[in-house]
Amino acid sequence: MTDLRHYDVIVSPVITEKSTMVSEHNQVVFNVARKATKPEIKAAVEALFGVKVTAVNTAVRKGKVKRFCGLVGRQSDVKKAIVTLAEGQSIDVSTGL
């Protein structure tokens, strides 16, 4: 895997109230590519941030149905990864890469 592939796997960090509360338990939340697997996510986080990952949990958030000027549309589904880091490791997602 090249660095370009790692950047393709991790789309963006998720910065919400719930994800900030989870960060107290050595966990970080990322939006990832829909086709990304748990081993690919683990390898990308370890390569890009230089940390040890102990677990990766994923969830797919289904897109909402939205209306605009009477037309019905649908937002895209988003895959979210909750990455658990080893004890004593941390990632500051607010500064970026």
Swiss-Prot record:
Record carries keyword Ribonucleoprotein: yes
Family annotation (SUPFAM superfamilies): Ribosomal proteins S24e, L23 and L15e
Keyword set includes Ribosomal protein: yes
Pfam family, one: Ribosomal_L23
GO molecular function: rRNA binding; structural constituent of ribosome
Signal peptide as annotated in the record: none
Name the record gives this protein: Large ribosomal subunit protein uL23
Naturally occurring in which organism (per UniProt): Brucella suis (strain ATCC 23445 / NCTC 10510)
